[in-house]
C-alpha cells in the first residue's frame, strides 16, 4: 500500500481525442493503430504538463492505464502500445510517467493499479471504470475534473 497519492489517467476520450479521429472505429477494426497516433490532445497540454510535473515533485505518482482496442491480437496490441507511448512522448514530453499500462480491452483498471483506498485517483471517461475504481475505495473523476484536482493538489489541499 502506498501513502503517496497515485494519479491514474486513461488516454482515449480522457486526454487523447481518439473518437474525433476520422474513421477511427473502421481503422481499429482493420488493425490499424493510426487513430491512436492521430488523436488530438483534449486540453491545454502545456498547462497540464506543468501541473503534472508540479504534482510529481510533491510526491504524486503518475500512471497511464489505457485499454487496447476491442479487436486485438498480440501483434496489434504491441502496435497500440507503441503508438500510445509515442503519443505521450510527443504531446507530453516533459512528463516522466511512473508507469504506463496498456491493457486488453475491458480489463478492470483498479485491479491493474492495485487500488487500496483513497490515495488512488482515476481520471477516466468510462463510467464502468470509475465505478470499479470506487468499489475499492479509490477516487474516480471525469476528465473535466483533471485541471481542478491537479490545482488543488498543487496548492496543498
Regions found by a protein language model. Give the residues of each.
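Conserved acidic residues
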Residues: 5, 98, 120
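Alpha-helical substrate-recognition element adjacent to the catalytic core
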Residues: 2-87, 91
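Acidic carboxylate-rich catalytic motifs and surrounding loops in phosphoryl-/glycosyl-chemistry enzymes
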Residues: 65-70, 98-108
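Short glycine/proline-centered loop/turn elements that form peptide/ligand docking sites
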Residues: 24, 126-132, 140-152
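Hydrophobic anchor at the start of a short beta-strand
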Residues: 62, 120, 138-141
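Short amphipathic alpha-helix with an adjacent loop that forms part of the alpha/beta core around
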Residues: 110-116, 150-157
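Short, structured coil segments at secondary-structure junctions
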Residues: 96, 135-137
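Conserved Lys-Pro-Asp/Glu-containing loop-to-beta segment of HAD-superfamily phosphomonoesterases
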Residues: 101-128, 133
Amino acid at each position: 500500500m502506498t501513502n503517496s497519492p497515485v494519479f491514474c489517467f486513461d488516454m482515449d476520450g480522457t486526454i487523447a481525442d481518439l473518437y474525433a479521429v476520422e474513421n477511427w472505429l473502421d481503422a481499429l477494426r482493420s488493425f490499424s493503430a493510426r487513430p491512436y497516433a492521430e488523436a488530438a490532445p483534449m486540453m491545454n497540454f502545456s498547462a497540464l504538463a506543468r501541473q503534472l510535473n508540479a504534482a510529481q515533485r510533491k510526491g504524486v505518482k503518475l500512471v497511464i492505464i489505457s485499454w487496447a482496442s476491442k479487436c486485438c491480437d498480440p501483434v496489434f496490441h504491441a502496435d497500440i502500445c507503441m503508438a500510445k507511448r509515442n503519443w505521450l512522448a510527443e504531446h507530453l514530453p516533459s512528463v516522466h510517467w511512473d508507469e504506463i499500462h496498456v491493457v486488453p480491452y475491458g480489463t478492470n483498471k483498479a485491479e491493474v493499479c492495485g487500488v487500496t483506498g483513497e490515495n488512488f485517483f482515476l481520471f477516466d471517461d468510462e463510467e464502468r471504470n470509475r465505478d470499479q475504481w470506487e468499489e475499492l475505495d479509490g477516487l474516480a473523476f471525469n476528465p473535466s475534473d483533471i485541471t481542478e484536482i491537479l490545482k488543488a493538489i498543487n496548492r496543498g489541499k
